[in-house]
Amino acid sequence: VEHGVTRRKAEPVTDGRRARGARRRAEIIEATLRVVQRDGAGGVTHRTVAREADVTTSLTAYYFATLDDLLVAALSTVADEYTRRLHEIIESDTDDLEGLAALVASAGGEGRRRALAERELSTMAARRPALRPVARRWREVVAQIGERHSTDPRAVDALVAATDGLCADILLTDARPDVRRIRAVLAHSLRTGED
């Protein structure tokens, strides 16, 4: 009580505006990924994303001032999912190459649409430098798996390249991926063939 007025301890303002903003931002990112999955990365504009998210174009521009901001956010969402799953593989007590092979194989199953969006956005990074750091993120974690098996940087590079190539191959075919075959290719990539 101060000057006859009872004061309550100040509570942080949690009127939901921040939570609504974060939710709206996430909805716009998910809409961007749906546009990429359906129309390709070239189909992403503030207008197409706004239509997909059922919001105004000005709202997408409010959260993402430039198209690069929108594309980086979309690619970051996919890259975060992949790196989280890769870290789970690294931290588990199971065969990490088997886990990596299963993750690669998922591009031919339930993860196909997401993998296709990631591939398209990563390829776009060749022309849009703002996307490059995010596009490299999953490769760095795959390299960590390689470093658990080999101290030879060529072998680690080969594992990263094999993983990337296998993902592309799966997306280009309708064949059901064989996890054992993928694991064998990944293991083979870690052998340099030189003494």
Predicted regions and their residues:
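Hydrophobic/aromatic-rich alpha-helical bundle segments in the mid-to-C-terminal region
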Residues: 131-132, 136, 148-195
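Hydrophobic alpha-helical connector segments
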Residues: 83-115, 159
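Amphipathic alpha-helical packing segments from all-alpha helical-bundle domains
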Residues: 83, 109-119, 124-158, 184
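Short alpha-helical scaffolding segments that buttress acidic/His motifs in well-ordered protein cores
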Residues: 103-104, 118-122, 159, 163-166
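Short, basic, alpha-helical segments at the C-terminal edge of helix-turn-helix-like DNA-binding modules
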Residues: 76-81
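N-terminal intrinsically disordered/low-complexity leader segments
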Residues: 1-23, 195
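Helix-turn-helix
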Residues: 27, 31-69, 73
